[in-house]
C-alpha cells in the first residue's frame, strides 16, 4: 500500500514551504488510495512546543488535509536507541569529541587546500583510554554514522537519476552529546517501521537522502521512493527563508485567503501545468502528476493568492455562505440577493461586512461641488425604501427629465452620492438592498 508522511517539527508555525511538502505527500497517498501519516518530529525537547503541535493540526484541518494517523517521535525514543545499538554492533557507529571550534578550523583548512570540507574521521583513531579522557574533559561525544565511501544512486521522482559520492559527504552526526536523537536516524527508523513507500521533500534534502539510504541498508532495509521538489523563492528570486514570517499559513488564513485558492496554487506552482482554481481537493488530486514538476527554483508571490481567492468566491453558491451572511445581520429575504450582488465585488469574505455596512447605513456621499444642487434635487425625488428592481430606472428617468442630464453626467454623480464609490455593483441592484434613503 502506498504510504506517505508529512513530518513537521513543532518548533514554529507552518508556512507555504511546509505546505508544499505536505500537499504533495497527501495527494500521492490519496490518489493511490493509500495512507497519509502526520508525524510530529519532536525529538528536540528545548524547541518543540505543544502549541505548535496544535497549530500544525489546526492549519492542516483548515486546508482539509486529513491524516489517517498521527505519530510522535518523542514517544519512539526506544526504537531509535535500538537502531543505534544495531549500528554500533555492525561497526557503523562511532563516537567523536571535536568541539565546534575544532571542526570549524578543520573545515577552513580543507577549504584553503582546495578540498571539500568533509569530516576527517580522526575519532576513529582514538584508543579507549583517549576516549575516556575526552569524556572526562568534555562529556559524552556525538555519534557519527560511518559512511561506505561509494557512490549512492537512486532515481528521483522529480530530479531523475541521482548519484552522490559518499566520500564527498561527512559522516553524519545521528546522536548529539546530550543524547538527543537527530532527524536523520529518527526519520530512517520511522520510515522503515511505518512502511513509508514514498518520501517527497525539498531539494535541500538531497544529500541527506543519500546518507539515509546507506543507514537504511546498514539496518537491513530497502529505501522508499524519493522525490525532491524545488525550493520556493520570492517573486524576484530572493530567498524565501527571510520572508517566511509573513507567509505562515495562520497569517494567510487571517488575511482571508480561501483554502482552495492556496491549495490550487501550491498544487501547480513549479509544474508545467497552468494554475487553475479547483473546486475541491478531489479535483486537485485527480490532476496531480509529480512528473510535471521541475528542478528549477519556484517563484512564489503571495499577491497571487488574492485574485485566486476572489475567483473562488465569485463561483461560490449562496448555500455555502448563508450562515456568514445571516451573522452580518442581512435580512433573510435579502440575503441571497446580497450575496449575488456582493460576491463579484469582493476579494475575501471579510469584504462582505463593508458592503453590508454600505447597504445598511448608506455610503459616505462623494459629491463634487458643482453636482451638489443636482444631487440634492435628485434625493428629494427619491421615495423612502424599500426599493424594488424598477426603482433605479424610474428614479433616474425622473431626474433626467427634470435636470436635462443624461449618460455619465446623470448616472455617475448619483452612483457616487449613493455609494461613495466610483464603481461597484449595478445600481439597480444596489437600490434594492438599501435599508435607508440616501442623504447628503
Swiss-Prot record:
Keywords recorded for this protein, A-Z: Aminoacyl-tRNA synthetase, ATP-binding, Cytoplasm, Ligase, Nucleotide-binding, Protein biosynthesis
EC number: 6.1.1.17
Compartment list: Cytoplasm
Cellular component per GO, a single term: cytoplasm
Cytoplasm found in the keyword field: yes
InterPro entries noted in UniProt: aa-tRNA-synth_I_cd-bd (IPR045462), aa-tRNA-synth_I_codon-bd_sub2 (IPR020751), aa-tRNA-synth_I_CS (IPR001412), aa_tRNA-synth_I_cd-bd_sf (IPR008925), Glu-tRNA-ligase_bac/mito (IPR004527), Glu/Gln-tRNA-synth (IPR000924), Glu/Gln-tRNA-synth_Ib_cat-dom (IPR020058), GluQ/Sye (IPR049940)
Catalytic activity from the UniProt record: tRNA(Glu) + L-glutamate + ATP = L-glutamyl-tRNA(Glu) + AMP + diphosphate
Domain of life: Bacteria
Molecular function (Gene Ontology), one example: glutamate-tRNA ligase activity
Binding site for ATP: 242
Motif 'KMSKS' region, residue range(s) on this chain: 239-243
Pfam family, one: tRNA-synt_1c
GO annotation terms (biological process): glutamyl-tRNA aminoacylation
Transmembrane segments: none
PANTHER family in the record: GLUTAMATE--TRNA LIGASE, GLUTAMATE--TRNA LIGASE, MITOCHONDRIAL-RELATED
Assembly: Monomer.
NCBIfam families (UniProt xref): gltX_bact (TIGR00464)
Membership in a protein family: Belongs to the class-I aminoacyl-tRNA synthetase family. Glutamate--tRNA ligase type 1 subfamily.
Name recorded for this polypeptide: Glutamate--tRNA ligase 2
Organism: Dinoroseobacter shibae (strain DSM 16493 / NCIMB 14021 / DFL 12)
